[in-house]
Amino acid sequence: KDIHILSSEIVSDRFRSDLNAVSRTYLYRICTAPVQNIFTRAYTANIPEIISESEVAAIRKAADSLVGVHDFRSLSGVKKKKGTVKEIFDISVSHSKETENDSFSLLTIKICANDFLYLMPEHIIEFLIKKGVDKEVRCNPAGLLLHSITYPDSCSVPSAGSKQV
């Protein structure tokens, strides 16, 4: 519901936001406390089963195994013969409190890849949680946020005052 435009640029007429991106980053926020923070619950999933640092360490280990180029057909909702080989550049897992005076524990998983298949971010999160907690958990889409998209500099059109080489 809340979208903020931080910047904009004039681009080529041939620019396609979905095809010209070089990387996309998704953020998945999980409240691991039994009771969710009422101020952040609209944008945070609640999975109170993740409680120990050893489980978070197991999630980190599973995340490390996904970094690189892999065929993600099994971790997507793709039914058509679309290219399923994608490269994950980085997966970071952090476990903290939402604020210093807060008793709510927050697990944040950030996934950066060259591209994502349909439902791939959710299935990656479910895979990581299964490896860490050894329990099947369905991803609540409330915790998934598109954090950023990176485009090459060549997509921008030079401004009227600049010289084109």
Sequence positions of predicted segments:
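Structured-RNA-binding interfaces characteristic of tRNA pseudouridine synthases
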Residues: 1-165
